Swiss-Prot record:
Transmembrane segments: 30-50, 57-77, 109-129
CDD domains xrefs: QFR_TypeD_subunitC
Chain's role: Two distinct, membrane-bound, FAD-containing enzymes are responsible for the catalysis of fumarate and succinate interconversion; fumarate reductase is used in anaerobic growth, and succinate dehydrogenase is used in aerobic growth. Anchors the catalytic components of the fumarate reductase complex to the cell inner membrane, binds quinones.
SUPFAM superfamilies: Fumarate reductase respiratory complex transmembrane subunits
GO cellular component, as recorded: fumarate reductase complex; plasma membrane
Organism encoding this protein: Citrobacter koseri (strain ATCC BAA-895 / CDC 4225-83 / SGSC4696)
Molecular function per GO: succinate dehydrogenase activity
Protein name: Fumarate reductase subunit C
Subunit structure: Part of an enzyme complex containing four subunits: a flavoprotein (FrdA), an iron-sulfur protein (FrdB), and two hydrophobic anchor proteins (FrdC and FrdD).
UniProt entry tagged with the keyword Cytoplasm: no
Length: 131
């Protein structure tokens, strides 16, 4: 059976997500993919420069010293930290850890993830700078 009535279509503006802070933050978090793409492409170019010898590598290092590239990399770092923070806050919701018949709160898990991140970062920096 078909009807001749026109279905109600709720109007939706292209800026619907700007009305609530939750959606604005969601769009910001999803937007962290763009700086991640920038950094991935930059890393691939760096690997190719490393493959093609010292002169190519020095050209890449010169490219990295450009102030615009430094600013883009700082933006990429901030985006990566925001993305990491949101994932670390999501992790306790995905894992139900029970200790002594009580569900563990999210704080120890989040703090543990940040500690692991800091330790791995320090180890990588040590290996890169002093090994």
């Amino acid at each position: 059976m078909t009807t001749k009535r026109k279905a109600y279509v709720r109007p939706m503006t292209s800026t619907w997500w700007k009305k609530l802070p939750f959606y604005r933050f969601y769009m910001l978090r999803e937007g962290t993919a763009v700086p991640a793409v920038w950094f991935s492409i930059e890393l691939i170019f760096g690997l190719f420069a490393l493959k093609h010898g010292a002169e190519s590598w020095m050209g890449f290092v010169g490219f990295l010293q450009n102030p615009v590239v430094v600013i883009l990399n700082l933006i990429a770092l901030a985006a990566a930290l925001l993305h990491t923070k949101t994932w670390f806050e999501l992790a306790p919701k995905a894992a139900n850890i029970i200790v002594k018949d009580e569900k563990m709160g999210p704080e120890p898990i989040i703090k543990g993830l940040w500690v692991v991140t800091a330790v791995v970062t320090v180890v990588i920096l040590y290996v890169a700078l002093y090994w």
